[in-house]
Amino acid sequence: MSKFLVIAEKPSVAQSYAKNLSAYKREDGYLEGESCIVSWCLGHLAEYAQPEEYDPKYEKWQFDDLPILPEVWKLKVSKDKKKQFEVIKTLMNRSDVEYLVNGCDAGREGELIFQRVYVLAGCRKPVKRLWISSMEDAAIQKGFQTMKSEEEYKNLCMAAVCRAQADWLIGMNGTRAYTTRYFKRLVVGRVQTPTLAMLAERQERIEHFQKEAFYKVALTDGKLTVVSENIANEEAAELLAALCNGSTAVVTQIKKERKKSFPPKLYDLTSLQREANRYFGYTAKRTLDMLQELYEEKLVTYPRTDSQFVTEDMKDSVEELVEKMPVLLSFVDYGQLGHGIKRVINNAKVSDHHAILPTKEAVEKGIADLPADKKNLMMLICQQLVQATGEEYLYEQTDITVKCQEHDFKARGKIPVQMGFKEVEKAFKQLCVKAEPVEEKEKETSIPAGYEEGMRLFSVKAEKTTHYTSPPKPFNEDTLLAAMETAGNKEFDSETEKKGLGTPATRASIIEKLVSSGYAQRKGKQILPSTEGKELVKVMPEYLKSAVMTAEWENQLLLMEKGEITDTQFMGEITSLVRKILEVCREIPEEERRRFQMEREVIGKCPVCGCDVFEGKQNFYCSNRQCDFALWKENRFLGSMEKNLDKKMARELLDKACTHVKGLYSKKKDMKFDADLLLTLEDGKPRFHLEFPKKKKK
């Protein structure tokens, strides 16, 4: 009997698939049933080979060996995952397996994970695609009933492959180029570099910020306070205050308007990561990791989404969810539920996956017993669903203008008429008292009653107040995610899809890479560029730092998913960029190339090429990158006599090829002795010899 093989991304997901496919027989690395087999990857089972695996000459980083442009891309099994790969490869080639099912995450990265394993295993069997947005049993069962051919996802797969190859080409070539030209490891990344540039640019603005004073004049009659526009000159402000103090002012205009604020949208991944950081201080990575676990536990829908809407066919199920939210949220009662379901429905703005929602299973199981951090996330998602479908916030805005000494002074008041969705927002904020408060854009204030147009205000008091411009704030996880999401948007026309730096699924890992590489650092909730990060940005050309160019690449990948451009077009541009990087690096002046090298003590001249020899942690090495000469501090020759090479010895060896060494130890005679250490060269390699100086005759 023929079977089909399902490949999941993780073991926990595979178990959910197996349960719904009645594949209960547990084997080493897979589960099997009568009609199917379910196995799993462990994230990326396969990856692109390193340059030295294409050609051994790339083991040594040489600028003249660049560019590295593979004609045929080589794949290899990821470290420590060979056993599981062999399991999948064997299953793929089993004679009773008729076709495969790609059950990896329904998105670009899931396509890449499956495609690499499929190619590396040399499989040619037909593939179907499982595409689901929830791990609930009903969603899984429906997904298997409505599978499409993998051929229908070929453009998505192509975009995934091109993204990975572009990152490899720019990373490998850019990093090797700048490292060899500056004699210091400098890591270049397609998305990482412009993100670091944003951090460095913001920090530079902060460090060079000079505050400037500006002034206002406030008038009051004891009840109402009105304020002038900003005044740049202090003397002018003082003069206006003096003129108005004790004068009679006139109310020239009172304008009342009924206004409304609309509820927020549902969460996509980035907006959820931002709010989780604001409310709870969670990093983007921590939020994504917990969301993935909640997804696999069947409590939330697919997390790596870029949509904040749901589709028309979900209307009834979403309404049912909203009605059940008071069961999960103690601070929400049924009277606060609105009827704004239409606002969250937009078929045109849902591509692969809809907005993040709690599942029916979450309602049935409850969230009370979850760990605190996961419970926080679940509450955040649930209350957002209530807010997004809630009633509008209505308020009355009053603007009053008072004229005094021919100058206008103004005040604004806001009085709530209907709290609507803000009632839930306020209750949730009170629940999260330990979290960093979310800044209110406008505070609720009221204009005192009893004022009418034409009314005179006698003997008003006038006072000059001093204010200062504020420096830009350092990025935190919330604001950096926002900047990445909108990077380059102003440069695109209205018809262009705006994708920013990275994707919702990759932004967290980009931030983590910057921190782990030492180019950025966390200071409390702030994310700051390190000294090394700022130095790296200084040597990078504008086109590598450009958020606009990188955002345009993301847009092109999206167009590729839609079949509007080809992989050849995209990769042609990436290859051209690689060549441009090398052209620029080749022209870096010699003096500029030494910018990272500190003034170092010259130990001597290299006996092979004549260049300076410097001291390293483990050796004394030639400064010429093309020369391999080095004297090792711990070497076998001296080590056998319990001695290491020190700076004085190295200096004398380089100067006159001889140094006198005291305290050498002979194991054979179990005694210490003194001798001359001689340096010679054999095929350019250092060789040591001992010579015992003749004792002088008395």
Whereabouts are the PLM-identified features?
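Intrinsically disordered, low-complexity regulatory segments
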Residues: 1-164, 470-471
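Conserved short loop/turn motifs at secondary-structure junctions
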Residues: 2-3, 101-106, 183-185, 256-265, ...
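Basic, low-complexity terminal or inter-domain segments flanking catalytic cores
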Residues: 2-5, 81, 92, 120, ...
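Amphipathic alpha-helical transducer elements in NTP-driven molecular machines
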Residues: 11-18, 35-38, 42, 78-89, ...
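Short, polar/flexible loop-turn hinges at active-site or ligand-entry regions and domain interfaces
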Residues: 73-76, 104, 124-128, 149-156, ...
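C-terminal or mid-to-C-terminal helical accessory/interaction module adjacent to the motor/catalytic core
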Residues: 94, 137-221, 256-257
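Metal- or metallocofactor-binding catalytic centers and their adjacent structured scaffolds
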Residues: 234-267, 273
